[in-house]
Each structure stands twice: as structure tokens, then as C-alpha cells.
Amino acid sequence: LVVMLESRFPGPARGVANCRQQVLELEKEFHYNRYLTRRRRIEIAHSLCLSERQIKIWFQNRRMKWKKDHDSPTPK
């Protein structure tokens, strides 16, 4: 059971070394295109050793952050 839980819910140590590089690559891709095709999402997921779902959710969250930053009026 412990092995199953560890594989389903990995701790923060998993992939920490690549985390900054992964975010950098995702940000570069987002700068180029805010929406991904499924084919591109698969390519990115494979190259960054992440799941398609992780890529999809990262882009959804990043679009919401972008929208929040660009839609809000500048405070005076």
C-alpha cells in the first residue's frame, strides 16, 4: 500500500532538479503560443517528462494568470 501511495502521490523531491528548467520551457512555449494543439502538448509532455494532463493544467492556469494580469485596470 505504501508503494502504491508513493507512486500515486509523489512527494516534492520527485523532479525538483528539473522543475526550474521545465517551467522555463513551459514559459517559452506560452510566450510563443498560449494555446496548444494536442500534438504539441504530447511533444512537450514527452520532452519534459511530464504527463499531458500536467501540461494542459499548467497552460490553463497560466492563461488565467495572464488574463488576470492583463485585464485588471492599473491602480492609480
From Swiss-Prot:
Subcellular location: Nucleus
InterPro entries assigned to the protein according to its UniProt record, in alphabetical order: Antp_homeobox_Deformed_sf, HD, HD_metazoa, Homeobox_CS, Homeodomain-like_sf
Protein name: Homeobox protein Hox-C4
PROSITE patterns the UniProt entry points to: HOMEOBOX_1 (PS00027), HOMEOBOX_2 (PS50071)
Keywords: Developmental protein, DNA-binding, Homeobox, Nucleus, Transcription, Transcription regulation
Organism for this UniProt entry: Rattus norvegicus
Biological function: Sequence-specific transcription factor which is part of a developmental regulatory system that provides cells with specific positional identities on the anterior-posterior axis.
DNA-binding region: 11-70
